[in-house]
Amino acid sequence: MDAIKKKMQAMKLEKDNAMDRADTLEQQNKEANNRAEKSEEEVHNLQKRMQQLENDLDQVQESLLKANIQLVEKDKALSNAEGEVAALNRRIQLLEEDLERSEERLNTATTKLAEASQAADESERMRKVLENRSLSDEERMDALENQLKEARFLAEEADRKYDEVARKLAMVEADLERAEERAETGESKIVELEEELRVVGNNLKSLEVSEEKANQREEAYKEQIKTLTNKLKAAEARAEFAERSVQKLQKEVDRLEDELVNEKEKYKSITDELDQTFSELSGY
């Protein structure tokens, strides 16, 4: 009986121990289940986080691809803008060279115009000298004509007296000799006056030819002055056009430089965004 009691006590003790172990195991099981649930929740959260990160990564990669495409396009636009700026600089240089050549031609034309004006003044002075000389020659010719008239009058008077002496030849030989001497003197003077008149006529013709040549040179100088004036106006017009073109090109260069600065700022902003995105991805 005692053995049975001891055995029952032992079995009860063993039962209690088993119950304690069962409670302990049940508690451990609950804790394990809780840990498993937490782990599953954490795994689920991690999976969701991973999916979100994958989605974010896809979006970032897509944004990066777009940014790279935009960057390539911006680089192309920048290269094109730099090419246009270089072309504009070349055009500006050519225009400046053309402007310098125009200024040189303008200075040359101005110098030639001054020389032509001086030559025209000299021609005007020569023309006035020739006019004065022509007036002097006309006065001299008038004097010679008066002398010629006087000589003719003397010749006629001599002839008349010669006829009178001839009629009185038989009566007064002395008067005849004096009349003949006077007649011979008058004829010699007539010959001298005729010779002088011929020389004056030749001089007058030469003077007329010289005056005609002077008039022709004056017309040529006037035409040359007119041509140089037209060239001067054309050079001034080209210079003014070149100056307006340079101002217009300078405005275009300023506009392109502003666009270039804006594009560089946009490029820097995109680069900063990419660096920030890479930093965030590296943090995860």
From Swiss-Prot:
Region listing for IgE-binding, in residue ranges: 43-57, 85-105, 133-153, 187-202, 247-284, 249-260, 266-281
Highest taxon of the lineage: Eukaryota
Pfam families for this protein: Tropomyosin
Presence of keyword Coiled coil: yes
Biased composition (Basic and acidic residues): 12-45
Annotated segments matching region Disordered: 1-51
Alphabetized SUPFAM superfamilies for the sequence: Tropomyosin
Coiled coil region boundaries: 1-273
UniProt-reported outcome of changing L95V: Nearly complete loss of allergenicity
Disulfide bond entries: none
Keywords: Allergen, Coiled coil, IgE-binding protein, Muscle protein, Repeat
Recorded consequence of changing S136L: Nearly complete loss of allergenicity
InterPro entries named in the record: Tropomyosin (IPR000533)
GO molecular function list: IgE binding; protein homodimerization activity
GO biological process assignments: regulation of muscle contraction
Recorded consequence of changing L53T: Nearly complete loss of allergenicity
Outcome (variant: F278L): Nearly complete loss of allergenicity
Entry domain remark: The molecule is in a coiled coil structure that is formed by 2 polypeptide chains. The sequence exhibits a prominent seven-residues periodicity.
Additional record remark: Constructed epitope mutant has significantly reduced allergenic potency, and hence could represent a candidate vaccine for treatment of shrimp food allergy.
Family: Belongs to the tropomyosin family.
Subunit structure: Homodimer.
Known function: Tropomyosin, in association with the troponin complex, plays a central role in the calcium dependent regulation of muscle contraction.
Name of the featured protein: Tropomyosin Pen a 1.0102
Organism encoding this protein: Penaeus aztecus (Brown shrimp)
